[in-house]
Swiss-Prot record:
It comes from Staphylococcus haemolyticus (strain JCSC1435). InterPro entries: BH2638-like_sf, UPF0223. This is UPF0223 protein SH1855. It comes from the Bacteria. Gene3D superfamilies: BH2638-like.
Length: 90
């Protein structure tokens, strides 16, 4: 898809790359499938960069407005189903 990722210009280049990598995992969930542990590892790194719940909600909202992909729903599905390894919207 062609859209911009929600980024904070105060982040380092590495942090921006890591946040984009997390959102790429969300895209994979909707477009193909994603490994749950891999997604949670990326989410953990995302939370190191964005520890504020309010900022997380704002970034998730911005991403959903641009992509129609609900990051919160995906993270909750993976968290609530630790026995599964592969996740997909299909």
């Amino acid at each position: 898809m062609e859209y911009q990722y929600p980024l904070d210009l105060d982040w380092s280049n590495e942090e921006m790359v890591d946040v984009i990598a997390f959102f790429n995992k969300i895209e994979n969930y909707y477009e193909n499938s994603v490994n749950g542990q891999d997604l949670m590892n990326h989410y953990k790194r995302f939370k190191e960069i964005v520890p504020s719940k309010a900022e997380e909600k704002q970034l998730f909202k911005e991403f959903e407005e641009k992509s129609n992909y609900n990051s919160y729903k995906v993270v909750q599905e993976v968290k609530n189903n630790p026995e599964l390894t592969s996740f997909s919207a299909k």
